[in-house]
Amino acid sequence: MASKYQSVQPGGSLIIAWRAQGKKVLIVGGGVVAAGRILHVLNADAHVIVVSPKAGLCKEVAWRIQEKQVEWRDRGFLVEDLSDDVNMVLTAIDDPSLSSEIYKLCKSKKIPVNAADIPPECDFYFGSEIRNGPLQIMVSTNGKGPKLASLIRKKIESSINPATGMALEKTGLLRQKLRDIVPEPENSRKRMRWMIEICELWSLEELAMLDENLINRLLGYFPKKTPSYREITTPAYSKIDNYIWFGAIIISGAVLLKHVSKAR
């Protein structure tokens, strides 16, 4: 008998969005692979420490050092680099034995570590990522096929509405303002239900066009009504049964006037 619950698919990774703001991430290496890792963690607002002699720096890493985007230690790896305040370690070097040594040291200190190109010595993987404003989508093959992950990511990315990133930004502003207006915990269900209805009713393009004026106008309907974009943006409006309907009776009103004129 088939279960009504979803089947377990073992062998996957736990894909989470880890908040790394201000956390110290140690990156051993300064080549092209390290450059990609550095960008990933800088995008997460982490404090990046690069350990690599100057001769091992690629142009991008050298530029980020020059721009003071990262902290740089101009030398090879030392055990002292694994201080107690390091939250994550990434190795991106062409020395498998040193990578393995760093991996073992990190495990002994319970520091999450990723050793590039050595899947068995990775606590986590870097997937192929899509970024559109607040939207982040990661495609991971769990180390099986990085190139395929990249191809799949491109297919997904091509299908994403260009307005998505801005729509998410504006939805976040609307959600925060609603929380500021009605912060009480007992209103959480009403807030959630109203926001769900807005997201289902409005298109991404409409959400992306929200500005402060429209947000304030929209919040005036909470919690009694979920208006459409057209209702709050059409200049002409009438009050019916204590609700504001924008432009909804213009056509019918014109027809009514025509009939009145004929009657006269």
From Swiss-Prot:
One Pfam entry for this protein is: Sirohm_synth_C
| Pathway field | Porphyrin-containing compound metabolism; siroheme biosynthesis; siroheme from sirohydrochlorin: step 1/1; Porphyrin-containing compound metabolism; siroheme biosynthesis; sirohydrochlorin from precorrin-2: step 1/1
Instruction: Give me the residues that bind NAD(+), please.
Output: V32, V33, P53, K54, A55, G56
Q: Supply the InterPro entries for this chain.
A: Met8-like, Met8_C, NAD(P)-bd_dom_sf, Sirohaem_synthase_central, Sirohaem_synthase_N
Q: What GO molecular function annotation could you give as one example from this UniProt entry?
A: sirohydrochlorin ferrochelatase activity
Name one cellular component (GO) term: nucleus
Catalytic activity, as annotated: precorrin-2 + NAD(+) = sirohydrochlorin + NADH + 2 H(+); siroheme + 2 H(+) = sirohydrochlorin + Fe(2+)
Q: Reply yes or no: does the keyword ATP-binding apply.
A: no
Q: Name one GO biological process term.
A: siroheme biosynthetic process
User: Where found in the cell?
Assistant: Cytoplasm; Nucleus
Q: Which domain of life is it from?
A: Eukaryota
The catalytic activity of this protein is classed by the Enzyme Commission as 1.3.1.76, 4.99.1.4
Its biological purpose is as follows: Catalyzes the conversion of precorrin-2 into siroheme. This reaction consist of the NAD-dependent oxidation of precorrin-2 into sirohydrochlorin and its subsequent ferrochelation into siroheme.
Q: What is this protein called?
A: Siroheme biosynthesis protein met8
What is the gene called?
A: met8
